[in-house]
C-alpha cells in the first residue's frame, strides 16, 4: 500500500505526521467545552400573550385558538400545544428537528404580528421566544441572614450579588426566587375614602401628578443658558404624607388622612427553602455554548469571595444545587474508563505477542487515535460530553484492532525469515485490504447512526461521528506508524527462538497452548464440513431459542442516571394559598430528613415549571454513592411510600430526564372536542392504568376547577348611578391586586415602585369586597362624587372556573401521566395499549402517547431504519472488496448470531433494551463482520494459490484464529470498565457495553464454525448459477466444473481477473 511504502521509506516524515496529529489534538483538547449531553438547537417556539383579567375560557377563544389557527399553516410543524390560564396564553409550537429554530421563530413572529389588530383591547403584544434547553439553571444559590429582613436581603442581592455574578463570563441570567423588592406601599383606607367622597383613581392621579419633576424650558442670557426644572419628586417616604389629594370644604385632604405610607417589601409571590429554612434563591443560567463546568467553577469562586466580603453583614451564600457536579463527575468517570480500557487492551496484546516492543508499537495507536480525535471534535464544534467520551471509551478496543491485525501479520512474516522491511511491507499489504474493509464497515454503521432523525438523532450525532473519526485515524496510524516502527525497530522477541524471562516463558507456554488450540480448531472446521446441516440447524436453533428471551428483557427510552438527586413535584388543590403550600412543603422536608441517605433539600414554590401558589418542586440531594447502599432509582420507592402519608397533596417522585425534561416517563394525551366525553375517556383510561402493575402516581390534567369570586355588574343599577364597568374594574384592580402607579427615587440613588393597595386584612373575603366604595358620576350638594358600595351595583358570587385549558393539535387535550415502579416502561405501555384496544373511542377523539413512551417508539423506528441502511452499506463494501455478490452474504449472516449474546448479556446484567443498548447493537453490526472478513480474505488468498475451498477455509481458521481472538478480547476488555457501570452515571452507560460484549462473545464463537459452513453452501449455489450465466470466450470461467472439492476454483471466491459473467455470483 502506498501509505505504508512512503512511511517505511521516510520514517522521519511518518513520525512528524504522528507528532502533528498529537499537537493538534492536545491543542484542541484544552479548548473543548465540557457538558453533560450535546447541545441541541431544538426548533421549539413559544408564544406568550397576556390578557389581564380574562378568564381561561376567554383566553382560549380569543387568544389561543386564533394563534393556533394562524400558525397551523406553517410548514414543518410537528405539534402545536396551548395552555390558557387566567389572563395568560402560552402556545408552544414544536417543529420537526431538521427545521432551523431561528427561521421557525421568525415565521411565527410574522404570523402572530398579523393577528395583533384582531385581538380585543387590553391584550398585550405577544412575546415570541425560542425554547433553549440550556436555559435551565446550572447552579442555585441560597442567600440567608439571621439579622436582615427579606427586603434588605433582596436589595443586597439585586445591587451587589446579582451584578457580581452576572458579569462572570458564560453567565447569561440570574433570576431571584422568593424575593421581596423594596417599595413604597400606599395602604388606602376604604372607609376614609368613602367619607371624603374620594375615588381611588383620584388618589392615584394625585400621587402621579405630585411625585414628578417637570422640565420648564431654558433661560438664555448671552453666552450662558440654564435649564428650568420644576422639582416635585418626593425626597423621602414621609414626604408622601403631605401630598394633597383633594379639597373638601376649602380644606386640603392629605394623603396621610386616607392612607398609610409604608417603606416595606413587596408581597412575596414565590418562596425558596433550603434545609427547611426560608431563603432568597438565585438561579444562574449559562449562555448558549458556554462550558458548563467552567462557568459553574467561576460562579463557585465568586460565591466564596462574596461570602468572605459579606460575613461582616451577617449574610451567607450557600450553593444548594450544582448541576455541573454530576457532569464533571461523569466526564471524569468516562475518562477513567477510557484509560482503564486502554490499559486492559494493551495487556491483551502483550499476552498474545509476548513482546514488549510489539506491544509498544501496537499500543501507540491508542493515544494517537484518541488525542487526534479531539482535534476533529473541536473542528466540528462538538464538546466533551457523555456521548463523545463514551464513543471513545467504547472504541478503545476497536482502535487497537487494526494495529493488532497488522502487527500480528508482520510478526508472522518475520517468523518466516524475512527481513524487517520486507516483513513490514508484505505483512501490511497482505492484510491491508481486509483491515480497510473492517474499518469501513464500522464507519458504514455509524454514518446512518449519526444522521438518525428525531430528538435522539441529535444526541447520537456526536457519538457516531466521533467513533467514525477515531477508527479512521487508527486505520491511518496502522498503515503508517506501525509498519514504519516494525521496519526500523527490530524485535528479537518476535522470533520463537528468542530467550524469555520468567513471565515470557509463562506467556510462551500460553502461546504453545494456543497453537494447539488453532490446530484443534482446524479439525473442528473439517468436522463441521462433514455435518454441515447439523451445524446450521444447531446454530439456527440457538438463534430461535434466544429470541424467546426478548419478552423477559424490558424496554425503556433511556435508563435513569444515578446522579444522586431526586425531584419531587407537589400540587395542592386549586385555590391553595402560598402560606398553605409553604406549610405543606415544610411537612415534606421534615419527612425527607428521616432518610439517612438524604443530604439536603431545596424547595421552590411558584417557580419555573411549577407555576402557581399551589405548586412546588423539591430537589433532594442524596449523599455520595459511596456512602449509601441504594442507587438513586432504588430510593424512589421508600420516599414515595413515606410521602404518600401526607394528606392534601398530589405528589410525584422521580428523576428528571435531562434529555426530555420531564419527571414522569409515561404520558398520553386524549384529544377531541367535547368536555363530557373527554372526561369519560379520561376516567376510563385512568382506572385501566391504575390496575396495571408498575403504574404509580397517576395524574390527569382533567380541568381542575379553582374557586373564584365573580363580580356580576347589574347594568341598570350601575347606569342609573353613572358607574361604568371600567370604573368598577379599575377600582377593584387597584385596591385588590395593587397598582404600581409611580416611582420613588431613594436618597441612595435606587428607584422603587410606589404601589396603591388595600391592607392584607382588608382583602380576605367576599364581604369585604362587597363593601368597597365606588365613586359615581353624580355629585352631591358640596360637589363631592356620590359614593356607593360595590354591593349596590354588582353581585359578588362565589363560583368556580377552570384553572387552565389545555389544547394540542387544534383540539382540547387531557393529559394522563404516570411514574413507573418495579417494571419497565415498555412493559407497562404494552399492557396499556392492549387494554386500550378493547375500549370504545368515539369518532372525533384520539389518543396519542407522549414523553418517554413516544420517544421510545420514535427512536426505535429510527434505529431500525439506520440498522437497515448500515447492513446495506456493509454489503456494498464487502462486495467491492471481494469482487463477489455471494461472499458478503456469508459475512452478513453472522450479524444475527450476535443477537444471542446481546439478549443473554442484557438478561444476565439486568439491563434493558433502551437507546444506549440499541446503539450498542448497531455498533456491534460493524464489529462482528471483522472476524468473518479476516477468515474470508485469507481463504480467498488460499484459493488463488490453487487450494480447495475447504482446505483454504481450514487454513484461514488456523492462521487467523490468533488475530480474531486477540481483537475480540481487546474489544471486550476495552469495554469492560464501562460495562461494570461504576461511579455516578455509570449504570446509564453500561447497557451499551453489555450488549456489545455479549454480542462479541456469541458472534465470535459461532461465526468461527458457521461462516466456513455457509461459504461451502454459497459456493455450491454459485456454481449452479454460473451454468446459466454466459461467460466471455477465453475466460477462466469456461473451465470444467468437475465437482472435485480438491481441484476446483470455488465460484464464490473469484479473483480480480474474473469477468462479469463469472463474478455476478
Curated annotation (Swiss-Prot):
PANTHER family: PTHR32063, SWARMING MOTILITY PROTEIN SWRC (PTHR32063:SF0). GO terms for molecular function: xenobiotic transmembrane transporter activity. Belongs to the resistance-nodulation-cell division (RND) (TC 2.A.6) family. This is Nodulation protein NolG. Pfam families: ACR_tran (PF00873). Keywords: Nodulation, Plasmid, Signal. The gene is nolG. Residues 1-33 form the signal peptide. It comes from Rhizobium meliloti (strain 1021). The keyword Signal applies. The keyword Signal applies. InterPro entries: AcrB_DN_DC_subdom, Acrflvin-R. Residues 1032-1052 are annotated as: Disordered. GO terms for cellular component: plasma membrane. Residues 1032-1041 have a biased composition (Polar residues). Involved in the production of Medicago-specific nodulation signal molecule.
Amino acid at each position: 500500500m502506498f501509505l505504508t511504502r512512503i512511511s517505511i521509506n521516510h520514517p522521519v516524515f511518518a513520525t512528524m505526521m504522528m507528532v502533528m496529529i498529537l499537537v493538534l489534538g492536545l491543542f484542541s483538547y484544552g479548548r473543548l467545552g465540557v457538558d453533560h449531553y450535546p447541545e441541541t438547537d431544538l426548533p421549539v417556539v413559544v408564544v406568550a400573550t397576556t390578557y389581564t383579567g380574562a378568564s381561561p375560557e376567554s383566553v382560549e377563544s380569543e387568544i389561543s385558538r386564533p394563534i393556533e389557527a394562524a400558525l397551523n399553516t406553517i410548514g414543518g410543524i410537528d405539534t402545536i400545544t396551548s395552555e390558557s390560564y387566567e389572563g395568560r396564553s402560552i402556545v408552544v409550537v414544536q417543529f420537526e428537528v431538521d427545521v432551523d429554530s431561528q427561521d421557525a421563530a421568525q415565521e411565527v413572529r410574522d404570523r402572530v404580528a398579523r393577528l395583533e389588530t384582531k385581538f380585543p383591547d387590553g391584550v398585550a403584544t405577544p412575546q415570541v421566544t425560542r425554547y433553549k434547553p440550556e436555559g435551565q439553571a446550572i447552579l442555585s444559590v441560597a442567600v440567608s441572614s439571621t439579622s436582615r429582613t427579606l427586603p434588605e436581603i433582596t436589595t443586597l442581592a439585586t445591587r451587589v450579588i446579582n451584578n457580581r455574578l452576572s458579569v462572570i463570563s458564560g453567565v447569561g441570567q440570574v433570576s431571584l426566587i422568593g424575593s421581596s423588592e423594596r417599595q413604597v406601599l400606599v395602604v388606602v383606607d376604604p372607609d376614609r375614602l368613602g367619607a371624603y367622597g374620594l375615588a381611588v383613581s383620584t388618589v392615584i392621579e394625585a400621587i402621579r401628578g405630585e411625585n414628578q419633576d417637570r422640565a420648564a424650558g431654558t433661560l438664555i442670557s448671552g453666552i450662558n443658558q440654564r435649564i428650568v426644572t420644576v422639582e416635585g419628586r418626593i425626597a423621602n417616604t414621609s414626604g408622601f404624607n403631605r401630598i394633597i389629594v383633594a379639597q373638601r370644604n376649602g380644606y386640603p385632604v392629605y394623603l396621610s388622612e386616607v392612607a398609610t405610607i409604608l417603606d416595606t417589601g413587596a408581597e412575596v409571590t414565590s418562596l425558596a427553602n433550603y434545609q427547611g429554612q426560608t431563603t432568597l434563591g438565585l438561579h444562574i443560567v449559562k449562555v448558549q455554548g458556554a462550558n458548563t463546568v467552567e462557568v459553574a467553577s467561576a460562579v463557585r469562586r465568586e460565591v466564596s469571595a462574596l461570602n468572605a466580603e459579606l460575613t461582616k453583614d451577617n449574610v451567607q451564600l450557600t450553593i444548594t444545587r450544582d448541576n455541573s457536579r454530576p457532569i464533571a463527575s461523569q466526564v471524569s468517570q468516562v475518562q477513567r474508563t477510557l484509560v482503564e480500557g486502554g490499559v486492559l487492551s494493551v495487556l491483551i496484546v502483550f499476552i498474545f505477542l509476548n513482546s514488549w516492543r510489539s506491544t509498544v508499537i501496537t499500543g501507540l495507536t491508542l493515544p494517537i487515535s484518541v488525542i487526534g480525535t479531539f482535534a476533529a471534535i473541536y473542528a466540528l464544534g462538538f464538546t466533551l460530553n457523555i456521548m463523545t467520551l463514551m464513543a471513545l471509551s467504547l472504541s478503545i478496543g476497536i482502535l487497537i484492532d487494526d494495529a493488532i491485525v497488522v502487527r500480528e501479520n508482520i510478526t508472522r512474516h518475520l517468523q518466516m525469515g524475512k527481513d524487517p522491511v520486507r516483513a513490514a511491507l508484505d505483512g501490511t499489504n497482505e492484510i491491508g485490504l481486509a483491515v480497510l474493509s473492517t474499518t469501513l464497515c464500522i464507519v458504514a454503521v455509524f454514518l446512518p447512526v449519526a444522521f438518525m432523525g428525531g430528538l435522539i438523532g441529535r444526541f447520537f450525532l456526536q457519538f457516531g461521528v466521533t467513533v467514525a473519526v477515531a477508527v479512521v485515524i487508527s486505520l491511518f496510524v496502522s498503515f503508517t506508524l506501525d509498519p514504519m516502527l516494525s521496519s526500523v525497530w527490530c524485535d528479537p522477541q518476535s522470533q520463537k527462538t528468542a530467550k524469555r524471562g520468567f513471565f515470557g516463558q509463562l506467556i510462551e507456554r500460553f502461546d504453545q497452548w494456543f497453537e494447539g488450540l488453532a490446530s484443534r480448531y482446524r479439525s473442528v472446521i473439517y468436522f463441521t464440513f462433514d455435518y454441515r446441516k447439523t451445524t446450521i440447524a444447531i446454530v439456527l436453533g440457538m438463534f430461535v431459542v434466544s429470541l424467546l428471551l426478548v419478552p423477559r428483557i424490558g424496554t425503556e427510552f433511556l435508563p435513569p442516571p444515578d446522579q444522586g438527586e431526586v425531584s419531587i413535584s407537589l400540587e395542592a388543590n386549586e385555590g391553595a394559598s402560598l402560606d398553605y403550600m409553604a406549610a405543606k412543603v415544610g411537612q415534606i422536608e421534615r419527612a425527607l430528613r428521616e432518610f439517612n441517605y438524604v443530604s439536603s433539600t431545596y424547595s421552590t414554590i411558584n417557580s419555573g415549571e411549577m407555576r402557581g401558589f399551589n405548586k412546588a418542586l423539591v430537589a433532594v440531594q442524596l449523599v455520595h454513592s459511596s456512602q449509601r447502599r441504594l442507587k438513586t432509582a432504588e430510593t424512589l420507592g421508600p420516599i414515595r411510600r413515606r410521602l404518600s402519608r401526607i394528606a392534601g397533596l398530589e405528589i410525584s417522585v422521580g428523576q428528571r430526564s435531562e434529555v426530555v425534561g420531564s419527571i414522569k416517563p409515561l404520558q398520553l394525551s386524549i384529544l377531541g372536542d367535547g368536555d363530557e366525553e373527554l372526561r369519560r375517556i379520561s376516567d376510563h383510561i385512568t382506572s385501566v392504568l391504575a390496575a396495571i402493575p408498575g403504574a404509580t402516581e397517576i395524574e390527569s390534567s382533567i380541568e381542575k376547577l379553582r374557586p373564584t369570586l365573580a363580580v356580576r355588574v347589574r347594568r341598570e343599577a350601575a347606569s342609573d348611578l353613572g358607574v361604568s364597568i371600567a370604573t368598577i374594574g379599575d377600582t377593584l384592580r387597584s385596591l385588590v391586586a395593587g397598582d404600581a402607579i409611580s416611582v420613588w427615587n431613594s436618597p441612595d440613588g435606587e428607584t422603587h415602585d410606589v404601589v396603591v393597595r388595600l391592607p392584607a386584612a382588608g382583602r380576605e373575603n367576599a364581604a369585604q369586597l362587597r363593601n368597597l366604595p365606588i365613586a359615581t358620576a353624580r355629585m352631591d350638594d358640596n360637589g363631592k362624587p356620590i359614593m356607593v358600595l360595590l354591593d349596590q351595583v354588582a353581585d359578588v358570587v362565589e363560583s368556580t372556573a377552570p384553572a387552565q385549558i389545555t389544547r394540542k393539535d387544534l383540539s382540547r387535550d387531557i393529559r394522563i401521566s404516570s411514574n413507573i415502579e418495579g417494571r419497565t416502561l415498555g412493559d407497562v405501555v404494552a399492557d396499556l395499549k392492549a387494554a386500550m384496544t378493547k375500549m370504545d373511542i368515539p369518532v372525533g377523539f384520539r389518543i396519542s402517547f407522549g414523553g418517554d413512551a413516544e420517544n421510545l417508539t420514535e427512536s426505535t423506528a429510527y434505529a431500525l431504519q439506520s440498522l437497515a441502511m448500515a447492513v446495506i452499506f456493509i454489503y456494498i463494501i464487502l462486495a467491492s472488496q471481494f469482487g463477489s455478490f455471494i461472499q458478503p452474504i456469508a459475512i452478513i449472516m453472522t450479524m444475527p448470531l450476535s443477537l444471542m449474546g446481546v439478549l443473554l448479556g442484557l438478561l444476565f446484567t439486568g439491563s434493558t433494551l433502551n437507546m444506549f443498548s440499541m446503539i450498542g447493537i448497531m455498533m456491534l453490526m460493524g464489529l462482528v463482520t471483522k472476524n468473518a472478513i479476516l477468515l474470508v480474505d485469507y481463504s480467498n488468498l488460499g484459493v488463488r494459490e490453487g487450494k480447495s475451498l475447504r482446505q483454504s477455509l481450514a487454513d484461514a481458521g488456523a492462521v487467523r484464529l490468533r488475530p480474531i481472538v486477540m481483537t475480540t478480547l481487546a474489544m471486550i476488555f476495552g469495554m469492560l470498565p464501562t460495562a461494570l457501570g461504576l461511579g455516578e452515571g455509570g449504570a446509564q452507560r453500561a447497557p451499551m457495553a453489555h450488549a456489545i460484549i455479549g454480542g462479541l462473545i456469541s458472534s465470535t464463537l459461532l461465526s468461527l464454525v458457521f461462516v466456513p459452513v455457509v461459504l461451502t453452501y454459497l459456493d455450491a449455489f454459485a456454481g449452479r448459477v454460473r451454468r446459466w450465466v454466459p461467460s466471455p470466450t477465453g475466460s477462466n470461467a469456461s473451465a470444467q466444473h468437475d465437482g472435485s472439492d480438491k481441484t476446483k476454483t470455488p465460484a464464490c471466491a473469484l479473483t480480480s481477473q474474473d469477468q462479469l459473467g463469472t463474478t455476478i455470483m
